[in-house]
From Swiss-Prot:
Entry's localization field: Cytoplasm
Superkingdom as given in the UniProt entry: Bacteria
Protein known as: Ribonuclease 3
GO biological process: mRNA processing; regulation of gene expression; rRNA processing; tRNA processing
UniProt keyword list: Cytoplasm, Endonuclease, Hydrolase, Magnesium, Metal-binding, mRNA processing, Nuclease, RNA-binding, rRNA processing, rRNA-binding, tRNA processing
An annotated Gene Ontology molecular function: double-stranded RNA binding
Pfam short name (any one): dsrm
Residue intervals passing through the bilayer: none
Phosphoprotein listed as a keyword: no
Quaternary structure and interacting proteins, as annotated: Homodimer.
Lineage of producing organism: Bacteria, Pseudomonadati, Pseudomonadota, Gammaproteobacteria, Enterobacterales
Length: 226
């Protein structure tokens, strides 16, 4: 692995690893090695959820559980994590198998998002919970400052449905048009058909649910509600 790129990545993360093998594992997709990052991803997902929930709890003392859950979902969802990954220029450091490299896996949102979670797990194991909490809060500083409770935090499918119901229009239909990849690493493509948009709107994700949410989000953008 390119030492210069790894050093630049650690600088952007705001953390230098003591155990380089943890960093290497966090950057390794299952297509590249049997010692991949999925266990670290599992750990990082739980840590991220706790840190963001704790931050929202103290930042919004009068907000109810529903709004806090929606804000947390916005902050920890895949496209937010993929945005962070692109800010870190993480794609250049990923260890991918030949098939994923050929298909552009270093750009795929799901792989980028999963790797951010794996890095969180790796930093925790390399240090402690207080350290990773401080690092996550630094990464999310602007996003936490900008987020607020309300309808904007409802998931895209809910907002699209409420918009259409409010105008007495038919509910959207979601159709799976493609499933790509092996069972452990699939990518779904969904077409969403709604009144007011002539052509189906496309969404992609690592599950049918995520692809439907992505399609609904694109529909909201086309309806100029985002």
């Amino acid at each position: 692995m390119n030492t210069l790129l790894v050093n630049q990545l650690q600088k952007k993360l705001g953390y230098t690893f003591k155990q380089n093998e943890l960093l290497l594992q966090a950057l390794t997709h299952r297509s590249a090695s049997s010692k991949h990052n999925e266990r670290l991803e599992f750990l990082g997902d739980s840590i991220l959820s706790y840190v963001i929930a704790n931050a929202l709890y103290h930042r919004f003392p009068r907000v109810d559980e529903g709004d806090m859950s929606r804000m947390r979902a916005t902050l920890v969802r895949g496209n937010t994590l993929a945005e962070l990954a692109r800010e870190f220029e993480l794609g250049e450091c990923l260890r991918l198998g030949p098939g994923e490299l050929k298909s552009g896996g270093f750009r795929r949102e799901s792989i980028l998002a999963d790797t951010v979670e794996a890095l969180i797990g790796a930093i925790f194991l390399d240090s402690d919970i207080q350290n990773i909490e401080n690092i996550i809060l630094k990464w999310y500083e602007n996003r936490l400052a900008e987020i607020s409770p309300g309808d904007k935090q409802k998931d895209p499918k809910t907002r699209l449905q409420e918009y259409l119901q409010g105008r007495h229009l038919p509910l959207p239909s979601y159709v799976v048009v493609q499933v790509r990849g092996e069972a452990h690493d699939q990518e779904f493509t969904i077409h969403c058909q709604i009144s007011g948009i002539d052509q189906p709107v496309k969404g992609m994700g690592t599950s049918r649910r995520k692809a439907e949410q992505a399609a609904a989000e694109q529909a909201l953008i086309q309806l100029e509600l985002e």
